[in-house]
Amino acid sequence: MRIVSGRAAAGVVKKLASRGAELNRLEPRVRRIVDDVRRDGDRALRRYALRWDGLASKQPLRVPEAEMASAWKALAPELRKSLRQAAQNIRRFCEWQKPRTWTRTRGGISLGQLVRPLESVGCYVPGGRHPLVSTLLMTVIPAQVAGVKQIRVASPNPPAEVLAAASMLGVLEFYRVGGAQAIAALAYGTESIPRVNKIVGPGNAYVTVAKKLVSFDCAIEFLAGPTEAVVLSHTGTPEFIAADLVAQAEHDPEALAIFLTTSRELARSVAANATRLAQGNPTAQESLRRRGAILVAASREQARQWANLIAPEHITVAPEDLPFIHHAGSVFVGDYAAQAAGDYASGPNHVLPTSGQARFRGGLSVTDFVKVITVQRLSSRGLRAIAPAVECLATAEGLPAHAESIRVRYERA
């Protein structure tokens, strides 16, 4: 990893702060796929699945429940135990996060909110280099805790581990389709796949562009790009820091791995450890070479400022730095809070905002699967208390019918 300091380091941060997802070049190609599926339904979906997902010509798009159950039965006992533990921790955290219905009454006015689950969601589980069974847990469990009744999972050529996890969670609808075509099917529906209210889950650039295109007709959580890891430390353990950077770098050659520090000695040690730990891991090596950097700040305040400007997906900090972090998808505190723990089993979600989106939202949560509906009930006493203010404001805005709708009520009250 390169070590950068002074104005050059500030320049790197400035460039990172203005980063965004490079999606425009793919848009025409992805739009054709989305339009094909929207127009031709299963015929287009199966054509793309045959070409890109390895689907057999007569293989059903929907995975039978028996196939998922068989995958669970065949799973190694140790992996079953690990999946159960991870699912339990994720579910518990989701229960803590769940927004509540409430009502407050004062002066004849009762106000509150209703929390209602979405009726249907699509959970996308990417294929690619690794079978991301953890993404199935992270997308399905919060939807279940929220109370979503119709949960549809889509994944290209799903491996046995993913099908097994789906069986463990009680998933009933699982479709072996992926890419932009899967997003289009979930958003608009086909003969085999009913449309959903919202689509969540990460994917490759084609999936991300497809989510962007369908977002005018179907809700999405956000557009997720390549993974990002930042570590902010001045006295930490070099091997631990390097291990976190390499762990996230192995996801993708485009993954971002940044270490922020004021210590040149620690910078050199982390660089050496990262080189050592990335040996034999070509993806991590390429990622660290292309998008990895160690930035040496002039002060702790500057390092904190840089962290917030980058607004990363993951960031590891010392306890004393936590109060100063305002923009991040997920924060890991202390030497033993490995970022991989959050990727799998500690409980918080690993579907997190990238490309600077952490400036305005957090990661996937139960709140993404519910609607908060406000409720208000006014007695005649309550209406009288606010009627003058409402009439005055309505008149000021030039909306006399608004004012009259108040007046006709309190005159009879």
Q: Language-model features: where?
A:
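Alpha-helix C-terminal capping segments
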Residues: 138-149, 167-169, 187-193, 211-213, ...
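Short acidic-hydrophobic, aromatic-tinged amphipathic segments that line or gate anion-handling sites
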Residues: 1-8, 173-178, 294-299
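N-terminal Rossmann-like NAD(P)+-binding subdomain of aldehyde/semialdehyde dehydrogenases
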Residues: 1-119
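A glycine- and small/hydrophobic-rich beta-loop-beta segment
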Residues: 247, 251, 259-328
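Conserved NAD(P)+-binding/catalytic subdomain of aldehyde/semialdehyde dehydrogenases
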Residues: 170-256
